[in-house]
């Protein structure tokens, strides 16, 4: 057994009548990578916020190096050597990468001038270990994945003894994720203890040493990774034997040959080039490719969400004249954004208001006034259909777990009864139970005749849920796989062939 650096026992925390933690516990050893698993709402975030000093426990004991400690604030946590990389990006967009990484120094400097050249040099040294990002760039100009890398680099600038990583690979490419895992191992070899929160079982079992499972605010079990299986972890998380993560696919004789959506010659600026594809009625079509390959850009161009794309979009044999996204919605083609909190949901508004946002006409009277009873009823119907967990559809979306927020975003799309729906990273940051439910709903939509396009960075998910997968690279569709050919190896091979072809042509 390794040296215990942090011990938390019998931790309790309540918010009014809601008991978020009940006898929670965690033991962290020096130099280990310790996974923390549980469904959204299990209490993981509350427990981590107590370690980070954001919240104070109502009861229980916290020992650091065997001594009782009270972590009164995030600054106190930093002084104790505790760093936290949150799932949601919290960079200041208007200043440089280097200034974000060393914000505490720039804010506390007593001199009139900061040595920004030195700051940038130090930032570049840290960033070289993670990703090739210019420390002088404005943070707001970076992609989501690049901003996530900066968040991780920012935490590494602290003299950490304990590092908390909350879904750190959610927006990273496979290459970036593998780089992060190497850095985690180097940090662990230096004696830093890492708490790794993720819903991705493959990552947990490949890179973590031990795992603690939480459910309903309680500690369920802590095991060595070698002594437990992914199935046992999932069953401990949900408190039951979970049905298959992916619902059965359609048999060949159940598939339709009717093309519901046909896209030809789609071009948009310098991001989408000569894209052609067909989507059949009741089909789930996957878009595979690395982050930045152009998968989202293709979907957004079809829906007229940005730029001025050229090309033909044909729905059920009828060529559409789409000027903007409102036209797309009216025609029954909708897009669920990968950034549900940025442009998918109104967090401070009610569930009902969010669900009805795309279809105000359905719940308005003849004079244009919203009929709240209709709004609530419609939201309640869709909430039950998606097994939304909330006290009331009048609750603010911000009070929900990540998985339930995603269900609200999906309900918002379903409210317009679409014929085609693009789902961009539909299960990102969602726990395994909610993931299985979303997969079931996607298949149910397809069975009702809706054409579904799923964009996901998780190849197992794409393969598990899709009937057919298109490979996208540099804004172009470069390959197609289905049936027995739909394997991770084949998809990656297609991407590699494209890379080699591009190199040869250059």
Curated annotation (Swiss-Prot):
Protein name as catalogued: Ribose import ATP-binding protein RbsA 2
Keywords: ATP-binding, Cell inner membrane, Cell membrane, Membrane, Nucleotide-binding, Repeat, Sugar transport, Translocase, Transport
Matching CDD domains: ABC_Carb_Monos_I, ABC_Carb_Monos_II
Role description: Part of the ABC transporter complex RbsABC involved in ribose import. Responsible for energy coupling to the transport system.
Subunit structure: The complex is composed of an ATP-binding protein (RbsA), two transmembrane proteins (RbsC) and a solute-binding protein (RbsB).
Compartment(s) of residence: Cell inner membrane
GO cellular component terms attached to this protein's record: plasma membrane
UniProt-listed Gene3D superfamilies: P-loop containing nucleotide triphosphate hydrolases
InterPro entries found in the cross-reference section: AAA+_ATPase (IPR003593), ABC_carbohydrate_import_ATPase (IPR050107), ABC_transporter-like_ATP-bd (IPR003439), ABC_transporter-like_CS (IPR017871), P-loop_NTPase (IPR027417)
């Amino acid at each position: 057994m390794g040296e215990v650096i942090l011990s938390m026992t019998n931790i309790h925390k309540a918010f009014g009548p809601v008991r978020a933690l009940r006898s929670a516990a965690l033991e962290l050893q020096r130099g280990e990578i310790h996974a923390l698993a549980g469904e959204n709402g299990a209490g993981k975030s509350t427990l981590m916020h107590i370690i980070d000093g954001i919240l104070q426990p109502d009861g229980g004991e916290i020992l650091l190096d065997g001594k009782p400690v009270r972590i009164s604030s995030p600054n106190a946590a930093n002084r104790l050597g505790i760093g936290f990389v949150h799932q949601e990006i919290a960079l200041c967009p208007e200043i440089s990468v280097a200034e974000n990484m060393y914000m505490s120094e720039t804010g506390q400097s007593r001199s009139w001038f900061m040595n920004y050249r030195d700051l940038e040099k130090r930032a570049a040294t840290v960033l070289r270990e993670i990703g090739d990002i210019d420390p002088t760039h404005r943070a707001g100009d970076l992609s989501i994945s690049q901003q996530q890398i900066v968040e991780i680099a920012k935490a590494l600038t602290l003299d950490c003894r304990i590092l908390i990583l909350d879904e750190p690979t959610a927006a990273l490419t496979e290459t970036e994720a593998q780089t992060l895992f190497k850095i985690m191992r180097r940090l662990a070899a230096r004696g830093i203890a890492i708490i790794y929160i993720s819903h991705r079982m493959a990552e947990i079992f490949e890179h973590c040493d031990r795992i603690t499972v939480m459910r309903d605010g309680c500690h369920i079990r802590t095991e060595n990774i070698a002594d437990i299986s992914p199935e046992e972890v999932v069953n401990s998380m949900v408190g039951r034997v979970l049905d298959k993560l992916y619902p059965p696919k359609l048999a060949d004789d159940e598939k339709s040959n009717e093309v519901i959506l046909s896209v030809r010659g789609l071009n948009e600026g310098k991001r989408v080039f000569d894209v052609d594809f067909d989507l059949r009625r009741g089909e789930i079509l996957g878009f595979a490719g690395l982050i930045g390959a152009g998968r989202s850009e293709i979907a957004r161009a079809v829906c007229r969400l940005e730029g001025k794309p050229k090309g033909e979009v044909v729905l059920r044999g009828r060529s559409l004249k789409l000027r903007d996204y409102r036209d797309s919605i009216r025609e029954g083609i909708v897009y669920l954004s990968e950034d549900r909190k940025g442009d998918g949901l109104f967090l401070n508004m009610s569930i009902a208001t969010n669900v009805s946002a795309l279809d105000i006409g359905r719940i308005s009277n003849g004079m244009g006034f919203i009929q709240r009873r209709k709004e609530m009823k419609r939201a309640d119907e869709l909430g039950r259909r998606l097994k939304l967990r909330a006290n009331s559809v009048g609750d603010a979306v911000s009070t929900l777990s990540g998985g339930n927020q995603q269900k609200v975003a999906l309900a918002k799309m379903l409210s317009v009864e679409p014929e085609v729906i693009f789902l961009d990273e539909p299960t990102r940051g969602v726990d395994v139970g909610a993931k299985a439910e979303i997969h079931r709903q996607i298949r149910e939509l397809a069975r009702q005749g809706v054409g579904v396009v799923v964009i996901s960075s998780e190849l197992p998910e794409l393969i598990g849920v899709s009937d057919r997968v298109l490979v996208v690279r540099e804004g172009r569709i470069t390959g197609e796989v289905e049936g027995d050919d739909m394997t991770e190896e084949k998809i990656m091979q297609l991407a590699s062939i494209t890379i080699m072809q591009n190199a040869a042509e250059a």
